[in-house]
Structure formats: structure tokens, C-alpha cells
């Protein structure tokens, strides 16, 4: 099908991208626009504990399911950072948004950075990176000695391809950290299992091989990195701290005792941090 401009579709809560992929979105509240970008294999449901309270505080909270995730369509293509950045532009354009605060969790750190590289900051006022997991560069190379060996990534890929449900079960407990009941884990697992197998594998692959270091250095909008010091999915010293070091003027706030899913376990603190980033009140 020929590419067309992105538009709001007749279906409720639906945006059609330039390549006619259907994206489900939710749009709560009025005021300062925040666009929430979900983690790997998660969807817009993950942001409930940010969107609901912030939408009552003069914030317009928007989140969408990435292609191949949740209620969005699975086109069988486009599971790369360029296309995901294009999808984000489709959302911002269709909703005619400007002055946006991007809130990017985990792999979405790469989406946010690539968006700024491809489209600039005309629509974006600032970016909050929540437990970034795609930046700066995960793979160990001669000029990235602190990265992870390619052989370990290949082991992980094989485990994902053999049985994604078993991989999730083996890695679920550290995600939120100690003191969390089984119910939130089951909630996250249900989201993950709504992701297409192809999208899951392709995004896991591109996340590990994409080098964002040069792109991070070119970011000009105010940037905040929030990261837990017990993040087993994306360790602080591998991702969050070097991401902050590469973005000019970025701020890094470390959440003590927090894992990768602190949007749930530390929701109130995160919400206060986002409000402070907007200039609303001290965190």
C-alpha cells in the first residue's frame, strides 16, 4: 500500500501511520503534553500509575502500544529504531502536539533518541529517560570495553526464540525487586505475552547492536535520567550513568533499591520527579 500521511482513524483510539500500521493510543487529561513510550514487550497499560494521577494535575497524558504490541497491529515489518521513530512522529503529528515531554522506559530510550536524530526537537521540549536499556551501546567492542559479550546476547536470543514464556518466568522476580507480590508480575507478564514473537525477537536484536553514542551527544533538549541501583535488566553502570554522561547538561537521579520496573514500585516518587522536571514543584 502506498504511504500516506499519518491520521486519526475512524476506529476509536487509533492512529494510522504512514505505512498504514494501526496504533492504539490513550489520551487522558488536558494541559502540558506528556507522551509515554513503553518498555520492551510492554504496552501503554504499564503507565497507568503515572497517567491517571498526572492527568488530574493539568497534564495531558498520552501513551500508545508500539507496533506488534498490545492492541496495535502486527504488520510484520518495521521493528527497527528508524521505523519506531517514524511511528512516534505519526502520533505527535496526528494529535498535533508540541511542547511535548517524552517519557521513555527501557528500550524506548533508543526510540526517543532516534526520534530527535530524525525529526529534531520542534515538537519536543524535554526527555525523561526511565531506566534506559538501549543507550548508549550495549555490545562489547574494542571501543566499548564495558559492554556485554556478543556470545551472551546470542545465548539470550536462543532462549527467547525457544520459549518466551519460560524466559519471562526465569527473569520475572528481579524486574520489580523484592517486596512485590506475584500480582504485579502477572500483570507485566500478560502485557509481554501480547507482543508478537517477531517483534519481540527483532527488537531484542536491534537493542543490542545499535550504537547511540554519537546521537546522544547531539541532544539539545533538557534531559533527565532516572535509574534504579538494583536494576538487573539494564544495570545503572552499563546504561543509565553513561547515557547521562553523554547528553550535554543531562541530570541523573538514582533511585536506591529500585529495579527496572520502578514505574510501579516507586510510582509516587517518579510522578513527583516528572512534575519537578516540568517545573511544577520540587521532587
Regions found by a protein language model. Name each.
Residues 249-283:
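Catalytic active-site module of serine/aspartate enzymes centered on a nucleophile-bearing elbow/loop
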Residues 138-148, 158-217:
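Conserved alpha/beta-hydrolase catalytic His-Asp/Glu region
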Residues 113-159:
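Flexible "cap/lid" loop of the alpha/beta hydrolase fold
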Residues 83-100:
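Conserved acidic catalytic loop of the alpha/beta-hydrolase fold
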Residues 218-258:
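Conserved loop-alpha-helix segment in the C-terminal half of the alpha/beta-hydrolase fold
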Amino acid at each position: 500500500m502506498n504511504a500516506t500521511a499519518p491520521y486519526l482513524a475512524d476506529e476509536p483510539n487509533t492512529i494510522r501511520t504512514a505505512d498504514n500500521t494501526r496504533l492504539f493510543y490513550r489520551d487522558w487529561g488536558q494541559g502540558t503534553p506528556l507522551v509515554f513510550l513503553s518498555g520492551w514487550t510492554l504496552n501503554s497499560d504499564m503507565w497507568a500509575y503515572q497517567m491517571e494521577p498526572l492527568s488530574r494535575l493539568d497534564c495531558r497524558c498520552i501513551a500508545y502500544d508500539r507496533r506488534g504490541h498490545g492492541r496495535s497491529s502486527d504488520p510484520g515489518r518495521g521493528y527497527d529504531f528508524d521505523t519506531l521513530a517514524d511511528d512516534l512522529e505519526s502520533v505527535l503529528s496526528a494529535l498535533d502536539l508540541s511542547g511535548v515531554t517524552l517519557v521513555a522506559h527501557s528500550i524506548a530510550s533508543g526510540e526517543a533518541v532516534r526520534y530527535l536524530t530524525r525529526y529534531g526537537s520542534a515538537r519536543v521540549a524535554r526527555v525523561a529517560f526511565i531506566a534506559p536499556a538501549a543507550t548508549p551501546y550495549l555490545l562489547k567492542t574494542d571501543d566499548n570495553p564495558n559492554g556485554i559479550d556478543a556470545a551472551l546476547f546470542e545465548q539470550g536470543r536462543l532462549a527467547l526464540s525457544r520459549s518466551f514464556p519460560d524466559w519471562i518466568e526465569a527473569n520475572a522476580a528481579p524486574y520489580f525487586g523484592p517486596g512485590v507480590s506475584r500480582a504485579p508480575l502477572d500483570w507485566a507478564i500478560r502485557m509481554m505475552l501480547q507482543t508478537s514473537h517477531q517483534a519481540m525477537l527483532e527488537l531484542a536484536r536491534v537493542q543490542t547492536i545499535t550504537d547511540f553514542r554519537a546521537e546522544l551527544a547531539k541532544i539539545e533538549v533538557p534531559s533527565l535520567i532516572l535509574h534504579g541501583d538494583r536494576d538487573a535488566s539494564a544495570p545503572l553502570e552499563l546504561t543509565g550513568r553513561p547515557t547521562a554522561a553523554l547528553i550535554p547538561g543531562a541530570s541523573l537521579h538514582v533511585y536506591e533499591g529500585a529495579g527496572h520496573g520502578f514505574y510501579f514500585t516507586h510510582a509516587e516518587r517518579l510522578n513527583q520527579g516528572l512534575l519537578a522536571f516540568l517545573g511544577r514543584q520540587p521532587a
